[in-house]
């Protein structure tokens, strides 16, 4: 066998082995979250645009009731949780072993919607307001904003009606004067039926990390590099969302994933992204926004004391400027 033939055979064998070798399996990341809505555009886009795939991540979400999301994480049934920041912070103050590793939504993209005869928040004195529960963060934020207007909790009555759909229906039926918090699509339905926007919360609340990604101490110990890649994909997704050139494609993605028509999708995108800048933080921890959440929770006695925001965050996921 000549040297040239032997070399050819060796190269061919190497090529065969390379072609036969399996690709590196993607790292599976399991996550608990509430039912998917416009507040989940970051993960929707990360899936649809391949940002998770680019980071070699197989994303597996499990949807459940809001109060179960953090419980699933602490029980060890998922790797991380996407939750209202308040749920995770409350759990942490009660001994839960979990940390914030990033932001999911920034600001508070809700509106106070009232009957058409009411023109300002002051008009709600003596009225019944549709709320979630006494310990709900939506109730806490509403009371704080009303207090800023000089309207104490004793001046109105909050009824524990339920979630956005139930609050919307309570306003539509005339059962209450207003809903303390509505977001797409229910705010649009109320407005289209002649109800009045009494407050865009973003006019009062400039900075709050409303939603967060949480990891358990166990997950952080066992799969930190994977979680870093996960948050990098989320950051890429938010940057993509915030680029105006992608608006039309984002609307199409929303239509497909949220099962809504083009008009609602376009209005929702405008409300969530350019108007409320809900994904402006690009997945990073927002110290100012966390401090505001801590202030609200302590004010309403949902946590026992006002601890430093660093207490709730894994230091490895802090933005460089905050370290």
Region annotations inferred by a language model:
Residues 1-7:
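Positively charged n-region of N-terminal signal peptides that target proteins for export
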Residues 8-20:
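Bacterial N-terminal signal peptides
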Residues 22-24:
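Signal peptide processing junction and immediate N-terminal pro/mature segment
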Residues 26-163, 167-173, 177-184, 197-207:
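Short, glycine-/small- and polar/acidic-enriched structural segments
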Residues 78-83, 172-173, 271-287, 319-323:
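Short amphipathic alpha-helical segments at helix boundaries and their inter-helical linkers
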Residues 87, 165-258:
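Pocket-lining segment of extracytoplasmic ligand-binding domains
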Residues 221-302:
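Secondary-structure end/capping motifs
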Residues 291-323:
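Conserved C-terminal helix/tail region of periplasmic/extracytoplasmic solute-binding proteins
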């Amino acid at each position: 066998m000549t040297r040239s033939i032997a070399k050819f055979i060796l190269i061919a064998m190497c090529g065969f082995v390379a072609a036969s070798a399996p690709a590196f399996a993607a790292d599976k990341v399991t996550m608990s979250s509430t039912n998917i809505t416009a507040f989940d555009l970051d993960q929707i886009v990360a899936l649809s645009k391949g940002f998770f795939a680019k980071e070699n991540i197989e994303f597996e979400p499990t949807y459940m009731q809001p109060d179960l999301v953090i419980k699933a994480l602490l029980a060890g049934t998922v790797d991380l949780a996407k939750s209202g920041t308040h749920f995770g912070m409350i759990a942490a103050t009660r001994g839960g072993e979990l940390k914030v590793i990033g932001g999911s939504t920034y600001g508070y993209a809700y509106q106070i919607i009232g009957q058409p005869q009411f023109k300002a928040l002051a008009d709600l004195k003596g009225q019944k307001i549709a709320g979630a529960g006494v310990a709900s963060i939506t109730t806490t934020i509403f009371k704080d904003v009303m207090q800023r207007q000089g309207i104490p909790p004793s001046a109105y009555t909050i009824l524990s009606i339920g979630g956005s759909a139930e609050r919307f229906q309570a306003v539509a039926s005339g059962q209450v004067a207003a809903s303390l918090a509505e977001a797409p699509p229910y705010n649009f339905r109320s407005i289209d039926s002649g109800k009045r926007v009494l407050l865009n919360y973003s006019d009062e609340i400039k900075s709050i990390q409303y939603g967060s990604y949480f990891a358990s101490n166990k997950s952080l110990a066992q799969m930190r590099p994977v979680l870093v890649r996960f948050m990098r994909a989320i950051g890429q997704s938010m940057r993509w969302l915030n680029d105006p050139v992608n608006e039309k494609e984002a609307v199409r993605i929303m239509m497909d994933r949220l099962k809504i028509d083009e008009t609602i999708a376009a209005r929702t995108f405008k409300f969530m992204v350019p108007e409320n800048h809900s994904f402006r933080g690009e997945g990073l921890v927002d110290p100012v926004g966390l401090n505001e959440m801590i202030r609200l929770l302590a004010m309403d006695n949902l946590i026992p004391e006002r601890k430093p925001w660093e207490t709730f965050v894994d230091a490895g996921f802090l933005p460089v400027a905050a370290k």
